[in-house]
């Protein structure tokens, strides 16, 4: 374990890298009632090619965002949002250009909520039916984003770089 101090921010970070490469960072906050946890992976909207065991794989555009939505689904027909609600936690997720992150905050049952987070992200549930359903939802989101002029300007600027 490693302890980093950020004196200008009056903050410390405890970090550890597990044998499987998972990096864990803890930011202790004395006096805080609410706890937060985030699991982030280096797979975002621009990541369409990757190498595994020496073999190159390419995925279609939008897979990271699609997976962000999909992993919330559970085999019992429910979803992780409902499971978190039972513990009083507030979950969410986002996909950026370079990562996908799942997170929650809550005032109690931190370890139970962390278990829920790790379980639904690390053991996703896919069926042909729920994949088809999600494809339609993602299509609607793309349409909504494309209706925002500020987003289109941003995307055009980024593509010009």
Give the role of each language-model region.
Residues 1-79:
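His/Glu-rich zincin catalytic helix
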Residues 75-161:
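Acidic/histidine-enriched segments that form metal/cofactor-coordinating
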